[in-house]
């Protein structure tokens, strides 16, 4: 038997957690995610967005959303750009571990849509220019995974 997720979002309720730090990028990721959800049939009234200060704060609110029982999937969006210190490494590692841990603990998909880039240019490319919009891609993944995970509910 082959299991596949559908790309029709009708009837799904989705939570989105967005880091405000680097908002000029994260707002584009959010725009892409909202576009992806709506294009695939998720009603605007079925999408809740929570803004948090930065990427490091994403896992806590994602956990609260995922454990609320209100959502079929949670999308996490943020942007961490390497600077001159090791802060980048700590933030990237902890956010990735936090979201990955939630994906395994919760009964719903928690999608990792946090950009971890070396440069501002790379972040811009992934927020809607050369490399597509990772927010949009995260939305499509959330829809597919929500349907796929329900096959074992």
UniProtKB/Swiss-Prot annotation:
Keyword Transferase in annotation: yes
A GO molecular function held by the record: 6,7-dimethyl-8-ribityllumazine synthase activity
UniProt-annotated catalytic positions: 87
Catalysed reactions listed for this entry: (2S)-2-hydroxy-3-oxobutyl phosphate + 5-amino-6-(D-ribitylamino)uracil = 6,7-dimethyl-8-(1-D-ribityl)lumazine + phosphate + 2 H2O + H(+)
SUPFAM superfamilies found in the cross-reference section: Lumazine synthase
Database matches in Pfam families: DMRL_synthase
Keywords: Riboflavin biosynthesis, Transferase
Name of this protein: 6,7-dimethyl-8-ribityllumazine synthase
